[in-house]
């Protein structure tokens, strides 16, 4: 039984350590300051660095020239377009504030101290994105706003060269972060025209830092016919360039709650690529060659997602794009938990209450395991006098002692792992809940009650962590403990203190879950113990 308790302690401490190191990497101010310093140390061009066509071997040189900017605005998204090349050089997410209680929208794509842009264009035989430069598109006005009652807005930008009219059109939809970016090539000449589309995302190259166990992730990702979802970090890009031929697929740049992704024509054969150059990481796709006969035209489609990790809408945008909400190895548990969380929130209209609701549902489902755990521990406690008698009788004869103990367990129908196994089974569920709360953009700046105005941030007054520690201390006092080893006793005594310290800086949503879970467990234990005592099993601590 002592070994079971030791295993339980080590397991809980391991889970706590992993979660704490993950939080440090995600939110530690010192690390964030280091990242900001790294970003501000580099200023790179948002134009140029166009990929080579499939029949070329060179990369287009950087071009620092910039045209004028055009603003496109829907109800949830504001894009800033550079008319030189038609690149998206800024995206403001109007439904997400940069800071709590701020009226400034969150800026995802941006230029300046940090380069983070979405580029697209046409290369190839008659491509207009070449060594000589990028096309200077013409547009009717500088600002376009989606009107009331209008569900969609199309903004065409035109460029004409050698008798060929190129039109790049951005289509914004109400309530959506999915932007259609289409090229129409109208060949008004007597010769055949060949172009090849591309889309790429460029980001200032960041160095890895923080935890070795569960590092946070800001970097590239892609999907292909062979691989539904795979991360490709900045460090991976520095080591080797991606070069994958695939039908369909997409490329993306991820950060905590947000993602930018290019989704090419899903019926075409595309090439996924990456590279690093002058402190800039690039991940993109290149589509197949499109041939336009004389006096005809062709349209090449693509989609740009630049917004929050909205699983439902991303799933509708492209296959596997919702996998950018990365739940780690516990995804098969986390996905239904998130579905349950959103369902409850739709009823109670408060994410904090939804977390409490999810906790109640999970603890109710796990109640049979909890009951089995405490029943087994109570039975083990009843056997302690007999086990102690065996120790005195057999002394250092460990083999005989082990044989007699197994015989005793068999006679009494007690599983020595019965008290520990249910907890080990529940640990993956807790880890899945952790990732669910950490990855849910819905919890960002979501209020609970009173002083808790952001469930994704720490409790500013540390009230929830202290309550959690108190509930854990009470739970420990109620739990049967046959531990006699002084070291183990000290570890168990200080566990509530250690957990409280860990949770001081955890997101309040996660602390709320743990506090609620402890309170429910206290009630369940009281019911279980009362029932066990009626059966003559003295389970309470004396």
Swiss-Prot record:
CC annotations in GO: plasma membrane
Pfam family of the protein (one): YidC_periplas
InterPro entries named in the record: Membr_insert_YidC (IPR019998), Membr_insert_YidC_N (IPR028053), YidC/ALB3/OXA1/COX18 (IPR001708), YidC/Oxa/ALB_C (IPR028055), YidC_ALB_C (IPR047196), YidC_periplasmic_sf (IPR038221)
GO MF, any single term: membrane insertase activity
Transmembrane segments: 7-27, 338-358, 417-437, 455-475, 494-514
Record's keyword terms, sorted: Cell inner membrane, Cell membrane, Chaperone, Membrane, Protein transport, Transmembrane, Transmembrane helix, Transport
Entry membrane topology: Multi-pass membrane protein
One Gene Ontology term from the biological process aspect of the record: protein insertion into membrane
Primary site of residence: membrane
Subcellular location: Cell inner membrane
PANTHER family xref list: CYTOCHROME C OXIDASE ASSEMBLY PROTEIN COX18, MITOCHONDRIAL, OXA1
HAMAP family found in the cross-reference section: YidC_type1 (MF_01810)
Function: Required for the insertion and/or proper folding and/or complex formation of integral membrane proteins into the membrane. Involved in integration of membrane proteins that insert both dependently and independently of the Sec translocase complex, as well as at least some lipoproteins. Aids folding of multispanning membrane proteins.
Complexes and interactors: Interacts with the Sec translocase complex via SecD. Specifically interacts with transmembrane segments of nascent integral membrane proteins during membrane integration.
Family to which this protein belongs: Belongs to the OXA1/ALB3/YidC family. Type 1 subfamily.
The protein's name in its UniProt record: Membrane protein insertase YidC
Organism: Actinobacillus pleuropneumoniae serotype 7 (strain AP76)
Gene name as annotated: yidC
